[in-house]
């Protein structure tokens, strides 16, 4: 809201998980965070979100949302990883300094306490790798990655365990603000698929 966006929330226990046809139709960007209750999300809602992403809605998947039905469906893989929760330090390195998502950041920033995610992360090779994380226990992780599916842009961003104040961190907030602007594609041109009539006369040959 501080960046001038019209923001609303949708939760699991709402009818249709708050993701009604109208909400999805009006959304330029959807941020998805989930934990433990991934299987409780109705497949019909997942399919509607999937269709909207293919049609151009941006999607930002946060932290344990890597196991969400929608992320798995879009990735086509298991999206599994290593994890450990002991409150260790995470250092996020910017590995694509020209990317709009990292605008205003230094070459790295740190979170004093976070859950560890470690490789191998079972996702397709990212189209753009934006962040790599190093953890105090020695692991590394591809913690900021972008994809395109249909007309939609997707950004996966690793930090955000619920027991730590990660989303109060100024750098994390900056990344999310930048990512919202990057994944949004309002006004993208419509394309026609299937059989089409020619737009110019075609002369008979032979």
Tell me the role of every PLM-derived stretch.
Residues 3-16:
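A short beta-strand-loop structural module common to alpha/beta enzyme folds
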């Amino acid at each position: 809201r501080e960046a001038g966006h019209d923001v609303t929330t949708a939760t699991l226990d709402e009818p249709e998980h708050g993701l009604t046809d109208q909400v999805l139709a009006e959304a330029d960007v959807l941020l998805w965070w989930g934990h433990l209750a991934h299987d409780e999300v109705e497949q019909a809602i997942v399919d509607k979100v999937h269709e909207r992403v293919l049609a151009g809605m941006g999607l930002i998947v946060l932290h344990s949302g890597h196991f969400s039905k929608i992320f798995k469906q879009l990735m086509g893989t298991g999206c599994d990883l290593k994890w450990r929760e002991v409150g260790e330090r995470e250092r996020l390195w910017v590995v694509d300094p020209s990317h709009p998502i990292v605008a205003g950041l230094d070459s790295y920033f740190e979170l004093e306490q976070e859950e560890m995610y470690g490789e191998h992360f079972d996702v397709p090779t990212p189209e753009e790798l934006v962040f790599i994380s190093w953890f105090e226990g020695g692991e590394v992780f591809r913690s900021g990655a972008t994809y395109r599916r249909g007309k939609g842009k997707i950004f996966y961003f690793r930090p955000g365990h619920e027991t730590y104040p990660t989303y109060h961190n100024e750098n994390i907030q900056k990344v999310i603000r930048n990512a919202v602007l990057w994944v949004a594609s309002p006004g993208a041109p419509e394309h026609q698929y299937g059989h089409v009539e020619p737009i110019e006369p075609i002369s008979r040959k032979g």
